[in-house]
Amino acid sequence: MNIGVLFDLDGVLIDTESLYTQFWSEINNTYPTGVDNFAYKIKGCNLERILTTYYPDTDSQKEILNALNKFEEEIQYRIFPGVIKFLSDLKNRGIPTALVTSSDIEKMRKLYNQHPSFKNYFDSIITGDMVSKSKPNPECFFKGASQIGIPTTNCYVFEDSPSGIKAGLDCGAKVIALATTLLRQDIDNSVAAIIDSFVDFDVEKMLLI
């Protein structure tokens, strides 16, 4: 079976999107960008892109980075219900997987501290500091697919954010969107499917898409 599966992290596998929305909304109140719906606009973007695009002042960057590090040390990385079962089924079937996230390696370290076995479910892990261009550029998905030896056109991509969904579509993958961050009606209708969670979704259903 020559297929692979590429997963985003926040809002797809772990329930953190609402926490990050609150964090970045508070940052935008303290360091106003003048951007409407700022916390939603930056979803899926890596930290470097956020800081260089919206906070060119180096002092502000340092203060925001310190606040983010403190925030990520304190939050609980809760894995969504059904996720481990789904990942285990893929592994048991020998279907290669990659985690493709805009998060940096330091944030991943904090996640692994809470869930030491989490990384064992993936054949490759691509973090935001491993690519030169952030989502919506599809570079990260091309890299993830290359790492598992499967063309992107033979991959499923699980995403929740507009930038991640666009990156998945632009790399030619079948995108399955999680309605965790966006309302169903706000999700790009070019996606292959929309699901609410992994609770009632399994690999057999994925393979029919």
Task: Cite the ranges covered by each PLM segment.
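N-terminal helical cap/lid subdomain that shapes the substrate entry/recognition surface
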Residues: 2-93
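Asp-based, Mg2+/Mn2+-dependent phosphohydrolase catalytic module
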Residues: 1-3, 88, 104-106, 110-209
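Residue-level marker of regulatory loop/turn positions in helix-turn-helix DNA-binding domains and
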Residues: 79, 100, 133
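Short beta->alpha linker loops
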Residues: 19, 42-46, 81-82, 103, ...
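Conserved phosphate-coupling serine/threonine residues in phosphotransfer and NTP-handling enzymes
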Residues: 12, 101-103
